[in-house]
């Protein structure tokens, strides 16, 4: 996978920012399934143990003593089409699953009609695996990660796009730029220190890492970002926040807009 291309064109549908959460799991004896959804990179804490054994930054099940395999079911915060999957086994070495697969469905009318979007694949220890979805034209709101037979996975990302047609917009003023309303980054000049996608986050920044930051410009010109709105609308005002940016905020900014009848991605 071309990681730079994927980051520019797809969002992580497994992000807790979108409201994604763990629905159920077969086991989480050594590590909580909720750690799969963490935004931060996995870490390793030397010599740290909890009541069940070595603390690991990921979802880890106990050793399987019966037939079958472990799984975790995840409810996506917003429905979307899945193009790629990232299964990260960072720091799981000797306790990673031997194989993994992913199923997905669009849950409605109290029915889970699962389809396979990633066939059974071999997993390596301490490795970030990238896989292409086998069903990238269907909309899903639930996924199931299957691991064979047991073990630990640090992070799971499902990269794709929200299905804007299924989003519910309020009959009042709302943030047209929010990622929760289907907006996405189309292109930007630079994002050396902070991703442009952070501009679309629906919450107040916690620190400088939650913003868009470019490297220092040494030549002529200026930095820019192009954002595609999830829904057309009339813009009444802008809120431009530079919280936590003290010696590295822009001196000026400007905003332009246009209406396109073409599907720009």
Predicted ranges, named:
Residues 1-71, 75, 159-230, 246-248:
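Disordered, acidic Ser/Thr/Pro-rich linker "stalks" and the adjacent N-terminal cap
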Residues 133-137, 153-159:
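Eukaryotic regulatory low-complexity N-terminal regions enriched in Ser/Thr, Pro, acidic
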Residues 54-74, 82-91, 95-145, 209-227, ...:
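A cross-kingdom feature marking solvent-exposed beta-strand/loop segments within repeated
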Residues 91, 149, 162, 244:
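Flexible, active-site-proximal loop/turn residues at the rims of small-molecule/cofactor binding pockets
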Residues 144-152:
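Short beta-strand-plus-loop segments that form exposed binding edges in beta-rich domains
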Residues 105, 148, 159:
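Mid-sequence acidic-hydrophobic segments that form the walls
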